[in-house]
């Protein structure tokens, strides 16, 4: 018989830096999950990813307090900021431009995000990421 799902917990945790402090501890503690077990498993799974990059994770908590988790790719905005070499996007994206990204960088980000975005072609994902870039005050070249 399959285990009964008790809850789904969605978090963004820095790669390789999960620890019992907020937001991880309180979110998992409410569900009765062994927090350190999750932290060790998450850090082991994300050790190949650049340390500190925020990784969305969906944790499935079962009624017997066991859990499984699925990691996603980093948010497009984070990858765009990294590609453009900026700390944050523009507060006024239509007026103040804060950086530039090339079409090649956009394609690379789209191919990275392809695992999470189902049913869309790379070109469609590129257009979506270009829109995100423009809304952050980045100029898309090429």
UniProtKB/Swiss-Prot annotation:
GO molecular function terms attached to this record: large ribosomal subunit rRNA binding; structural constituent of ribosome
GO biological process: translation
Keyword Cell membrane assigned: no
SMART domains: RL11 (SM00649)
PTM comment text: One or more lysine residues are methylated.
CDD domains: Ribosomal_L11
Highest taxon listed in the record's lineage: Bacteria
Gene Ontology CC: one annotated term: cytosolic large ribosomal subunit
PROSITE patterns, alphabetized: RIBOSOMAL_L11
Record function comment: Forms part of the ribosomal stalk which helps the ribosome interact with GTP-bound translation factors.
Family: Belongs to the universal ribosomal protein uL11 family.
Annotated PANTHER family: 60S RIBOSOMAL PROTEIN L12 (PTHR11661), LARGE RIBOSOMAL SUBUNIT PROTEIN UL11M (PTHR11661:SF1)
Protein name: Large ribosomal subunit protein uL11
Organism for this UniProt entry: Photorhabdus laumondii subsp. laumondii (strain DSM 15139 / CIP 105565 / TT01)
Gene transcribed to yield this protein: rplK
């Amino acid at each position: 018989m399959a285990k009964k799902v008790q809850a789904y917990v969605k978090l963004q945790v820095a790669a390789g830096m999960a620890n019992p402090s907020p937001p991880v501890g309180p979110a998992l503690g409410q569900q009765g999950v062994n927090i350190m077990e999750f932290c060790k498993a998450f850090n082991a799974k994300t050790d190949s990813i650049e340390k500190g990059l925020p990784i969305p994770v969906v944790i499935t908590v079962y009624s017997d307090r066991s859990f499984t988790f699925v990691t996603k790719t980093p948010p497009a905005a984070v990858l765009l900021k990294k590609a453009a070499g900026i700390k944050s996007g523009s507060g006024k994206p239509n007026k103040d431009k804060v950086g530039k990204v090339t079409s090649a960088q956009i394609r690379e980000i789209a191919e990275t995000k392809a695992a999470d975005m189902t049913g869309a072609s790379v070109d469609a994902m590129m257009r979506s990421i270009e829109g995100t870039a423009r809304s952050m005050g980045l100029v898309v070249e090429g």
